[in-house]
Amino acid sequence: MSPYKAILRPNGFTFKQFFIAHDRCAMKVGTDGVLLGAWAPVTSVKRVLDIGSGSGLIALMLAQRTSEPVQIDAVELDEEAATQAQENVAASPWAHRVHVQQADVVEWAQRCEHSYSLIVSNPPYFSPGSQCASPERTTARYTTGLTHEMLLDCAEKLIDEDGFFCVILPASAGSKLLEQALQRGWHLRFRTDIADNDTRPANRVLLALSPQPGERLLDSMTIRGPDRQYSAAHCRLTRDFYLFR
């Protein structure tokens, strides 16, 4: 058997240091989660919260990027996804640092006794309307269960004074969340606009918000270059995770 076929298992996705099984998760490993996990600022991070963790992908990426004392809590509403995330964590090198909770994050936040220096979320972004094929996928991608206002409420309750709240969203949804956040007193600190290639406008945005003002760093990135190969910027961002790079 080819070593590549042995590594690229059909029920999930193999990264350099861990494997993500996602066959029981509504949302599979995708570009958005990988970008957020590789991009979120981790300097001086003490404790991390991943809201809507799904398969546990972003939590494990952040575990790889942070040092031994850092603890990571991952909260996921769907029972099957949370169970699979727990299994993925248990099979990883960071099982002692990543803790998966199956819970509604709005209720969980009310009883949480910790604050976090980094909160990340790849949140729902479709408004109610047409529904997905499965109720689990609807929950994962439609704001009927977790609106952006509710997400900001949770982040405000749980964030450290000098912490960062990071999300990835489609460009239009990101603009709306950013407007809501600024109205509530958040400050934009980092923003990366992402285009599929250099002939198209940005269709995703990475945002890092903080309760505290500070220098703004704004940039942009394309995922693929004119030759349809991954761009140098994308390769630099994700090289610690993707195989064969």
Curated annotation (Swiss-Prot):
GO cellular component assignments: cytoplasm
Record keyword Secreted present: no
First-tier enzyme category under EC: transferase
Compartments, as annotated in UniProt: Cytoplasm
SUPFAM superfamilies given in the database record: S-adenosyl-L-methionine-dependent methyltransferases (SSF53335)
Pfam families assigned to the protein according to its UniProt record, in alphabetical order: MTS
Chief location bin: cytoplasm
Catalytic activity, as annotated: adenosine(37) in tRNA1(Val) + S-adenosyl-L-methionine = N(6)-methyladenosine(37) in tRNA1(Val) + S-adenosyl-L-homocysteine + H(+)
Example GO molecular function: nucleic acid binding
UniProt EC number: 2.1.1.223
Residue pairs linked by disulfide bridges in the UniProt entry: none
Superkingdom of source: Bacteria
Entry-linked NCBIfam families: tRm6a37MtseTrmN (NF047853)
Role noted for this protein: Specifically methylates the adenine in position 37 of tRNA(1)(Val) (anticodon cmo5UAC).
Record family assignment: Belongs to the methyltransferase superfamily. tRNA (adenine-N(6)-)-methyltransferase family.
HAMAP family (UniProt xref): tRNA_methyltr_YfiC
Protein name, UniProt field: tRNA1(Val) (adenine(37)-N6)-methyltransferase
UniProt source species: Erwinia tasmaniensis (strain DSM 17950 / CFBP 7177 / CIP 109463 / NCPPB 4357 / Et1/99)
